[in-house]
């Protein structure tokens, strides 16, 4: 059995809002595995975050973040249960942190995997099943390998499964769970939009080095223009 430290217990408590002794027991029962311990607490009905997950979230906040230089912009809506929490500084900070997270994740397109269109999922699965690396393997092994790769691909597209930029040891989903436990209300990231300056516009490709060289190249010396010959009329002598 893995040794359970006070840090492990505190981490689980922050994620779930369960009691210290319940968290310790959950970790002991699951050999120190945090994810299994969370599932254990939910099954036992001891996770506060799990208890709140079904409650209606009709309040919240729409916030924005513009990255330095104005190259990237984000709009995000995060919902909670009451306007009291929506006005809370901790909630406002959470929403702003999520907006910054979105700005830092160019590949993220969805909040969670249940938003991904089924036709996209099927297409990705078909491509993976046709891989040369799987030729000759039994169907059940193929299915297991493909499902693992597919899950990884889909999670890479979803905000909640990204490592949190301020603490890579947790995901955005876990950050949200911590906030739920701390503020005592259910919360959800409802939707977001990420803007990138010039995205979708066809730009004329140019070689910067060549442009600079052309601008700094000394101009060829101009030859002085040839002087036009002028004929002078000889003045006749007066008689």
Curated annotation (Swiss-Prot):
Q: Provide ranges: composition bias, Basic residues.
A: 229-239
Region of interest: Disordered = 213-239
Q: Give the matching SUPFAM superfamilies.
A: Elongation factor Ts (EF-Ts), dimerisation domain, UBA-like
Q: Where in the cell is it found?
A: Cytoplasm
Fetch the Gene3D superfamilies from UniProt: 1.10.286.20, DNA helicase RuvA subunit, C-terminal domain, Elongation factor Ts, dimerisation domain
Q: Which CDD domains match?
A: UBA_EF-Ts (cd14275)
Record region (Involved in Mg(2+) ion dislocation from EF-Tu): 82-85
Can you list the GO cellular component terms from the UniProt entry? cytoplasm
The UniProt function text for this chain reads:
Associates with the EF-Tu.GDP complex and induces the exchange of GDP to GTP. It remains bound to the aminoacyl-tRNA.EF-Tu.GTP complex up to the GTP hydrolysis stage on the ribosome.
The entry assigns this protein to a family as follows:
Belongs to the EF-Ts family.
- Protein's recorded name: Elongation factor Ts
Recorded source organism is: Acaryochloris marina (strain MBIC 11017)
């Amino acid at each position: 059995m893995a040794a359970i430290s006070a840090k492990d217990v505190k981490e689980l408590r922050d994620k779930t809002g369960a009691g210290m002794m319940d968290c310790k027991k959950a970790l002991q029962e699951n050999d120190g595995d945090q994810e299994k311990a969370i599932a254990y607490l939910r099954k036992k009905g001891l996770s506060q975050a799990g208890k709140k997950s079904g409650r209606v979230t009709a309040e919240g906040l729409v916030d924005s973040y513009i990255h330095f230089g104005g190259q990237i912009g984000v709009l995000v809506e995060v919902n909670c249960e009451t306007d009291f929490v929506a006005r809370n500084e901790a909630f406002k900070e959470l929403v702003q942190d999520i907006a910054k997270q979105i700005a830092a994740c160019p590949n993220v397109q969805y909040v969670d995997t249940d938003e991904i269109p089924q036709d996209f999922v099927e297409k990705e699965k078909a491509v993976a099943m046709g891989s040369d690396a799987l030729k000759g393997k039994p169907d059940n092994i193929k299915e297991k390998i493909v499902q693992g790769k597919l899950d990884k691909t889909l999670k890479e597209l979803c905000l909640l499964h990204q490592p949190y930029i301020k603490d890579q040891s947790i995901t955005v989903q876990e950050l949200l769970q911590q906030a739920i436990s701390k503020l005592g209300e259910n919360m959800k990231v409802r939707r977001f939009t990420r803007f990138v300056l010039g995205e979708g516009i066809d730009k004329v490709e140019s070689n910067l080095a060549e442009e600079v060289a052309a601008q700094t190249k000394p101009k060829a010396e101009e030859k002085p223009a040839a002087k036009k010959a002028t004929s002078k009329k000889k003045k006749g002598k007066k008689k």
